[in-house]
């Protein structure tokens, strides 16, 4: 008969197992400090990591132990302690007894400084390499995690500012193993799409190691080599990442990236109206000035002797005023029609409007379905409608031979 444990029984068994293994007690471990927090209670919580793994650590009453009080993110240390298992939460951690600094800067930061020096020497951070963002973008490319808050912030802010802009999304890992390659591939792929006006690559906030992919030299060079203008939009305020320095523009958050690059539709319309008012006033001022000048000439003795000439000039003034007014009204109406026509064309391309016309989009595992071979029986399928989503399970696939 199978043994079934309660959660408490299982955790108690694990703790007993760990406590009985000598190798889990009184050992040294070397790594880099991360996510460090000093508490007023006298306890110190942090992680220690290398290039592949990390483990949680705690030092209770650290002031009573041989533990430095100035440890910081990135410090390389040697730690002496024991494995601890917190039974109530099932947490596995190292209980630090002694910590010794191995280097003032962690290996990652030391490597980063070398890369910064190298790229600075090559002039890759210079303003002369920065490309300007387009004033009126129609299509934006985004490289970020498909399920992250960053993407939702970008979509929400774009729809609020100019809802007919199209967003091309390249889903990519933004932390962990393989993140660098996916970010680079995303930038390269979006650069090949002619319609895209500029690219945003980034993510929401996190610990420094979560953001570290954007500090890798290869990723920074992908930003620098982008043929299209590119914004580094990583959610952090403390320091500049390497991608911030090689990108054409840096934004502290994905939301700010949209605010920097996408104009507000209402502001554009207000600006157009203000320009219309300004041109109308300018025209009126010019006509009034001409009136005054000609009236002064009329009063001149020489012109008084030629009433026919004066009358002709007066009629010319009235005629020119009418012509100028009609020309200005025609010009303003033409520009307004051009602007409204462009807005209508952009709105037609909006995928949201396609949904409103009754069409749907189906996805399996966050990938769009184009043909039946993209799905399998019992796949969970999400169908996007104009007012929501439907989750269904594929029970049967029916191929239609008469469909081109």
From Swiss-Prot:
Its EC number is 3.1.11.6. One of its GO terms (cellular component) is exodeoxyribonuclease VII complex. It catalyses: Exonucleolytic cleavage in either 5'- to 3'- or 3'- to 5'-direction to yield nucleoside 5'-phosphates. Keywords: Cytoplasm, Exonuclease, Hydrolase, Nuclease. The keyword Nuclease applies. Pfam families: Exonuc_VII_L, tRNA_anti_2. Transmembrane segments: none annotated. It is found in: Cytoplasm. One of its GO terms (molecular function) is exodeoxyribonuclease VII activity. GO terms for biological process: DNA catabolic process. PANTHER family: EXODEOXYRIBONUCLEASE 7 LARGE SUBUNIT. Bidirectionally degrades single-stranded DNA into large acid-insoluble oligonucleotides, which are then degraded further into small acid-soluble oligonucleotides. This is Exodeoxyribonuclease 7 large subunit. It comes from Fusobacterium nucleatum subsp. nucleatum (strain ATCC 25586 / DSM 15643 / BCRC 10681 / CIP 101130 / JCM 8532 / KCTC 2640 / LMG 13131 / VPI 4355).
């Amino acid at each position: 008969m199978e043994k079934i444990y309660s959660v408490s029984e299982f955790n108690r068994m694990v703790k007993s197992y760990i406590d009985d293994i000598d190798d889990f007690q009184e050992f040294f471990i070397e790594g880099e400090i991360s996510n460090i927090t000093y508490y007023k209670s006298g306890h110190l919580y942090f992680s220690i990591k290398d290039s592949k793994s990390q483990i949680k650590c705690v030092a209770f009453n650290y002031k009573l132990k041989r533990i430095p009080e100035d440890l910081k993110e990135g410090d390389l240390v040697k730690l002496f302690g024991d494995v601890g298992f917190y039974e109530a939460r099932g947490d596995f951690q190292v209980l630090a007894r002694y910590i010794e600094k191995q280097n003032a800067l962690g290996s990652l930061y030391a490597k980063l400084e070398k890369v910064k020096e190298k790229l600075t020497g090559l002039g890759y951070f210079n303003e002369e390499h920065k490309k300007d963002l387009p004033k009126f973008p129609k299509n934006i490319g985004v490289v970020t995690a498909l399920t992250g808050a960053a993407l939702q912030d970008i979509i929400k802010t774009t729809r609020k500012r100019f809802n007919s802009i199209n967003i091309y999304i390249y889903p990519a890992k933004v932390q962990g193993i393989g993140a660098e390659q996916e970010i680079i591939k995303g930038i390269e792929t979006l650069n090949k799409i002619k319609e895209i006006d500029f690219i945003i690559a980034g993510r929401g906030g996190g610990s420094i190691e979560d953001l570290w992919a954007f500090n890798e030299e290869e990723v920074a060079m992908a930003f620098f080599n982008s043929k299209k203008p590119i914004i580094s939009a990583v959610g952090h305020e403390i320091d500049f990442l390497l991608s911030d320095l090689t990108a054409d523009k840096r934004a502290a958050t994905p939301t700010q990236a949209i605010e920097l690059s996408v104009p507000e539709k209402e502001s554009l319309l207000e600006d157009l109206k203000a320009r219309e008012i300004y041109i109308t006033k300018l025209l009126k001022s010019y006509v009034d000035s001409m009136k005054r000048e000609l009236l002064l000439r009329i009063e001149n003795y020489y012109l008084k002797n030629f009433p026919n000439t004066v009358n002709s000039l007066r009629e010319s003034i009235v005629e020119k005023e009418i012509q100028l007014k009609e020309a200005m009204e025609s010009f303003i109406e033409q520009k307004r029609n051009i602007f409204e026509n462009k807005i209508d064309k952009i709105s037609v391309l909006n995928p949201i409007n396609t949904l409103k016309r009754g069409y749907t989009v189906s996805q399996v595992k966050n990938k769009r379905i184009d043909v039946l071979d993209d799905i399998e029986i019992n796949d969970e399928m999400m169908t996007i409608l104009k007012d929501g989503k439907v989750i269904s399970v594929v029970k049967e696939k029916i191929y239609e031979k008469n469909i081109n």
